[in-house]
């Protein structure tokens, strides 16, 4: 994936404008930590009175709705409730975004942190919520990577570094409202999300509508440690290729029947090589400095 050459121009965040922060990320890609901890903490440390920050989390909305349904229907499991509240989650998410827009303050920099996955691009989001192109801007954050995955024509906009580190975060995650490492389907769900990004071009996805080309900005962030040269042997690469090439995203029965053994074998290799050894560095301090630079010096315009 190649980006157009960056211009030197940087556009500073202005009072009275609204900035939507959106991430193109995998499961456990650092999105929630980026929003809830790093940005919220950094803006508070810099000058909290300067910003009006709202966060809208699709996962949190779905968890709340699932718990409400389960309370009314004690014979249903959380998973059953979770599966039933998808449409209501989408409606409530849109309503909360609109409410956040309406809470705009003219004397502050308004930031809406959009905690939701957008594997199909943000075109629909722009059409739904970009009503004032003079004061609404969309900052799309993607992982800063060295080399994207390309296995015999199977192309993904993420690096093997990023893919492995996100998986390890998922494996060791507990207490999340939607997906945890101990969940039986966690590997299949992770690969399903990854599959949605096959042949995905970040730049084309965010610039597909010329109407908004001056309102959307692409920003790279060090969500993971890209300093290591990660390689897998040919047999492991073939194993991964055979799974991801034919996998039908979120068809859990098909995945379990046809690919579960190969999936487990592949991730067992990853676990043995990289889990629990302190191989990858923590990048949160680096991300914080990148956020400070953005807040103080503005957005790089592509």
Predicted regions, residues:
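Phosphate-binding P-loop
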Residues: 10-18, 104-105
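Glycine-rich phosphate-binding loop used to anchor ATP phosphates in small-molecule kinases
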Residues: 83-147
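The conserved Walker
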Residues: 26-27
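Conserved substrate/cofactor phosphate-moiety recognition/catalytic segment
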Residues: 33-107, 167
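N-terminal pre-Walker A segment at the start of P-loop NTPase domains
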Residues: 1-12
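Eukaryotic short linear interaction motifs
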Residues: 30-31, 55, 62-65, 120-123, ...
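Hydrophobic anchor at the beta1->P-loop junction of P-loop NTPases
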Residues: 21-23
């Amino acid at each position: 994936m190649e980006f157009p050459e960056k211009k030197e121009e940087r556009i500073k965040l202005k009072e009275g404008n609204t900035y939507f922060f959106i991430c193109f990320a995998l499961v456990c890609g650092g999105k929630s930590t980026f929003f809830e901890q790093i940005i919220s903490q950094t803006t508070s440390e810099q000058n909290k009175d300067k910003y009006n920050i709202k966060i809208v989390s699709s996962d949190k909305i779905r968890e709340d709705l699932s718990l409400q349904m389960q309370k009314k229907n004690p014979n249903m499991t959380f998973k059953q409730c979770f599966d039933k509240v998808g449409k209501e989650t989408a409606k409530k998410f849109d309503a909360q975004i609109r409410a956040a827009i309406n809470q705009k303050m003219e004397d502050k920099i308004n930031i809406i942190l959009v905690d939701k996955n957008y594997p199909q691009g943000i075109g629909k989001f722009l059409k739904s919520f970009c009503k004032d192109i003079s004061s609404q801007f969309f900052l799309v954050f993607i992982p800063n990577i060295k080399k994207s995955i390309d296995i015999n024509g199977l192309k993904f906009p993420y690096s093997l570094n990023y893919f492995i580190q996100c998986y390890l975060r998922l494996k060791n995650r507990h207490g999340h409202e939607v997906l945890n490492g101990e969940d039986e389907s966690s590997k299949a769900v992770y690969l399903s999300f990854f599959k949605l990004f096959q042949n995905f071009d970040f730049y084309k996805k965010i610039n597909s509508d010329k109407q908004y080309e001056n309102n959307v900005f692409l920003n790279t962030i060090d969500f993971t440690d890209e300093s290591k040269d990660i390689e897998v042997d040919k047999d492991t690469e073939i194993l991964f290729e055979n799974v991801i090439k034919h996998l039908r995203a979120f068809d859990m029965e098909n995945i379990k029947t046809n690919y579960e053994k190969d999936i487990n074998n592949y991730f067992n290799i990853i676990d043995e090589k990289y889990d629990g050894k302190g191989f990858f560095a923590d990048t949160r301090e680096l991300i914080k400095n990148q956020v400070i630079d953005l807040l103080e010096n503005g957005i790089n315009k592509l």
